[in-house]
């Protein structure tokens, strides 16, 4: 596929300050923003996901916010298809992909793997095997992948065997092959802050969420969706549901949300650092205006 177009990725951990920079850059480039956040796709989940408010958009068009009900599953595959449809149908426009869900961003910039979807009949057969029989099959079909899996991890072992039974090819080989379904070249930008400052921003943001009415938001959603809301496993919602169900105190919920958010930020940082194509900017060492100016220049000189 010929590379004809360019787009920018603005990534980084939760609370780092992606929103302000992306808005300023979008205005400078006359660009549209594609939200790349696995939680902001859900309608009604506003405060807890730090969803951008209408007045904060400053007239910039945003995509993939509030597109599905919380009862519906929205996967990385859905995201990849939706984003590529937007990109490929509007190739003359400038786009910023902004968010912290690394798996989602990677599916667009590098493509999705060609591994087959789960097969019900194959899964039913594999559940009849005991652990030793399953392990022996996995070693037979794909020794390389199996050696990286704990012998008692049935889920991963079943997947190794399933892929071979469905395709006749090894999981370890197929998982390295991706299909990229767009003709865009991506300038990958990642934002960071010194850890102490980032964690302080996260803690303060959680306090603001509670002041804005997070508890009431979750209560209202829980009345509508019940445990289906809990199954989304979104930080800020599960903790409040536990509070609603008297499993923890409100103070404990606040503490857990802050702790889980900090842990999530650490995982995000690790994910993006592993991708060497990202160019990093530390917001504690350079102004937002300088970062926007630099990204603008990079975008216009990159072939």
From Swiss-Prot:
Binding site for substrate: 14-19
Site feature: Interaction with substrate tRNA: 101
Gene3D superfamilies recorded: 1.10.20.140, P-loop containing nucleotide triphosphate hydrolases
Keyword Nucleotide-binding: yes
Binding site for ATP: 12-19
Needed cofactors: Mg(2+)
Any GO BP annotation: tRNA modification
Catalytic activity entry: adenosine(37) in tRNA + dimethylallyl diphosphate = N(6)-dimethylallyladenosine(37) in tRNA + diphosphate
Keyword tRNA processing: yes
InterPro entries in UniProt: Dimethylallyltransferase (IPR039657), Guanylate_kin-like_dom (IPR008144), IPT (IPR018022), P-loop_NTPase (IPR027417)
Subunit organization: Monomer.
UniProt function note: Catalyzes the transfer of a dimethylallyl group onto the adenine at position 37 in tRNAs that read codons beginning with uridine, leading to the formation of N6-(dimethylallyl)adenosine (i(6)A).
Protein's name in the database: tRNA dimethylallyltransferase
Gene name tied to this protein: miaA
